[in-house]
Amino acid sequence: MAMKIPKSGYNRFMKEGAQHFKGTDEAVQRNIEACTELASQIRSAYGPNGMNKMVINHIEKLFVTNDAATILKELEIQHPAARIIIMATEMQEKQIGDNTNTVVILAAALLEHAANLIHMGMTPQEVAAGYEQAAEKALEILPTLVVKEATDMKNIEEVRQYIRSAITSKQYDNEDIIADLVAKACVTTCPANSFNFNVDNIRICKIIGSGVHTSTVMNGMVFKRGAEGEIREARDARIAVYTCPFDLTQTETKGTVLIENADELRNFSKGEEAEVEEQVKAIADNGVKVVVAAGKFGDMYLHFLNKYKIMAVRLTSKFDLRRLCRTVGAQPQARICAPAVNLLGHCDSVAVQEIGDENVVVFDKKSETGKVATIIIRGSSQSRIDDVERAVDDAVNTYKALTKDGKLLAGAGAVEIELAKEIESFGAKAPGLEQYAIKKFAHALETLPKAIAENAGMPTTETLTKLYAEHVAGKKNAGIDIWKRETMDAVVNNIFDLYAGKRLAIKLATDAASTILKVDQIIMSKQATGGPKPRGPKAQDEDDDGMA
């Protein structure tokens, strides 16, 4: 029997192929390098002049976007430290829907400055403690920098100003068009108590062709399909909705019928036809002009629906069916019957229209503010439309956040410079080694306006110097004007940042950086090989809000 020499160190406890990194040089520095490398890919996408990234994911779907959450999600990054920052951006996306780039860039800047402090002799724990003190101070100062509060969420002009900045960072040059569409859609569907606003009530229909400037918004719903029968339009229509197929039910058992002469053949389906006509006539007698069903329409039912001038629309998605019921005020029926009048929905116009080369069914509630609005997005390519959709989502989420907390800050990098100035002076007065980390926190905040200037092609050092001079002179709202390539008053130019979004971004970025700094060991088991990849959860409607 051959002698087996045991491994030395930590590897003796681990399986073959496991990896282990320990200490400042191996673990902490590796993590910092991974996170700064990640942020370097995202930094050029920050701000109105940010560059787009072209990402092709594992199923070869193409994304052209500058949205950090989308880029990081589709890259499928595996590094454990980088994953911590990605989880922070996912939380920001989930709670606010904007400022995801801010989280990545700020967290990486904090780690980059921490690497310098560690190299000078500070411990990661001291750096993390200093960062936490600085973040606490920043969150204390932030409420004093509020410049405006959104009060009237039913005023389209006012709402347009507030959501414009969220769109500008995604769709520069189209921000006015998109802001107008989103403001109209949000105000139309906003309930009496704006706190109860539901983002699921803003629907998006994407149709390739023309340009973004031809996009429209309407009060109602649009479905990318045609009508089933011959009737293609109904005005002032009562609508019956069925969750079952609009067809004859078939029994599971098969039967055999013996037909001996022509009369028996002629009379074979006469009773069936009479029954179907009776059902459709009863529906028509209730004033129904449109029938919507979740399944297919049988030929015989379609014949009699055409005879009684009833429009037939098929929706295959149960989620679309629920939203339509909410839009028109109908109660869905589980079987074919003539529903009572109070169970029917109503719509001013239901019509099949051709937009581009696509047939769509439009449920238009012209006469009233409805519960659901649809934004029809046009564009020259699928990736272009998808990016506009992401900008619309950000704007709608901004409106939602404003209904919860209406406080606004000056945008264009003004808040970051003011915070950096205040925290720098706070660090100068702080005792102990933490003061160096506090000052570095202030320098990390400068990274955000610096990225805006850099992506706009402006000299960064000169721009930051001018900004600091303005803020020291008491102009707290001085930000970067990328058009005139100089400083400006962000509030006068209606450039705002969400208070809630900025607050959460600072908190998440600091927490992510502190967590990574406090890791001194990385232990990775050998990856399992062979066998299929575990299946994820069954796909659901991504916009479903769990309605019953």
Swiss-Prot record:
It is found in: Cytoplasm. SUPFAM superfamilies: GroEL apical domain-like (SSF52029), GroEL equatorial domain-like (SSF48592), GroEL-intermediate domain like (SSF54849). GO terms for cellular component: chaperonin-containing T-complex. Residues 527-548 are annotated as: Disordered. One of its GO terms (biological process) is protein folding. The keyword Protease does not apply. The keyword Transcription does not apply. Keywords: ATP-binding, Chaperone, Cytoplasm, Nucleotide-binding. It holds the Pfam family Cpn60_TCP1. Disruption phenotype: Low and diffuse subcellular localization of pgl-1 in embryos rather than confined to granules in somatic cells. NCBIfam families: chap_CCT_theta. Belongs to the TCP-1 chaperonin family. Molecular chaperone; assists the folding of proteins upon ATP hydrolysis. Known to play a role, in vitro, in the folding of actin and tubulin. Required for correct subcellular localization of pgl-1. This is T-complex protein 1 subunit theta. It comes from Caenorhabditis elegans.
